[in-house]
Amino acid sequence: MDKLRSPYHDTMRIAGEVAERNAWAAKASDFSNDYSLWQQVGQTNQKGKFDDIVNLFHNRFETIQEIFRTQAGFKASGSIKQIFREKGRNKDYNIVGIVLDARRTKSGGKMVTLEDRTGTITVFVRKDDPACATIMTDEVIGVSGRFDKSGGEMFWVNRVVYPDILTSNQNKGGGDFDPVSIAFASDIHMGSKEFLEAEWDKMIEWMNSADETAQNIKWFVLSGDVVDGIGIYPGHENNLTITNSFEQYEMCARKLDELPDHITPVILPGNHDAVRPAEPQPMLEPAVQEKFNSAIHVGNPARITLSGIDVLSYHGKGIDDIVPRVENVSYEHPEEAMKLMLKKRHLAPMWGERNALSPEEEDQMVIRTPPDLFVTGHTHAHTVEWHRGIPLVVSSTFQGETDFMNMLGYKPKKGFL
C-alpha cells in the first residue's frame, strides 16, 4: 500500500496547507455530486469580422473598467477626452485605458499609449515602477499621475494599477462546501507514444484503494489535452500510437471508466483536443461526449462550482504569450503567469499573437470575480502557489518527453496528481 500511495499521497491536494488531515477523512461517496457551471463558453455566431473584434474590445474595456471601480477601488477621473479638456498642471488624474502600444525608452522606462472610446493618450512609466516590466498590449490598466509641468501633453505616471484581487473580495466558497477533495491533472495525451500508461494505471489503482485520501476524492478535473490529437505539429504522426482522434477519445473513456463510482471526471479541452484552436474553446462535440459514461464536459476556460468550491479551470495556452514578454515568467514557473492573469483579470490579454482568440460578443476570458481556486495545465509543469489567498494549481502531465518538447526545451514534471 505504501508503494502505491507514495507518488500521490503528499501531492494529492492543497488541503494540507488549509486544514488538518483528519478534517478531510470524510468519504466522498457520502456526498452528492452537486455542481453548477457559471457560463458555457465558445458557443458563438460571430463571423470574425473587424466589427466583431472592435465590439470584443469595447466589452473588455467596459467590463474591466467596472471591475476597477467596484472591486479594485480605482475610479477614472473621466474619459481620455474629458481629461485632456480639463487638464491642469498640478492636478492628479486617474486614467483607465486599453494598452494600444508599449515601448521601452533609452532610460529603461516605457512609453505607453492608452486608448478608450474617446481617444488616446501617451503616458510615461518609470523603470522603477514594478508594473513597468509586466505591461502588455491589449490589456486594460489604470494609471495615476500628472501632465507635464510645461503644459504639454506628456502624462507622467506615479503608479500603474491593475484590477487585482483584493483580500476583501475573496469568495472562499462562502464557507458552505462539502469536506471532499478535488484531484487535478492535465495534458494526459492518450494516443501518444509517450503517454505514461503505467503511471496512469497505478494512479487509478490507488484511487480505487481504501486509502482515506483516495476515498475523499469527489472530483477529478482534467484541464485539457486529454488526448494527443492529430496534426498538431510537423511530424506529429510519428509520435502517435493511435492515429485516429476518435479512437484516442475511446481509449480515454475506457481509462476513465475505471475510476471508482465516487469520483466524477470533469473534462475541458486544450489545444490538442478536437475543437477549434481559438479560445474560448467549446466543450467536446456530442459525438465525442457520448463515448464517456459519467464525465462532465465543459468549455475552456470553465468556471464551475464543485461541492461549493468555485473553480476557475483554464488549459493555459495564454501563457505562451506571457512568457516571451514578461521578465521572470517561464515555462518552468507558469504560476507566475497565473498570478499576472489574476492581477490583470484576463486569461489571455494579447490579441493575435501565439494564442488564437475568437471575437465573441462578450469577452469570456475576463476574470469577472475572484475564484476560490485557479488551475491550469498546458506547460507540463507542476506546482502549487498562492495569490492573495487564492490557491494556484499547475496540473501535472502524464506524457513523457517527445522530440518536439526536446526541441522547445520542455522538461515536464510528470506523473503528479
Identify what each model region corresponds to.
Residues 1-417:
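Extended recognition/assembly regions associated with phosphoester-bond processing machinery
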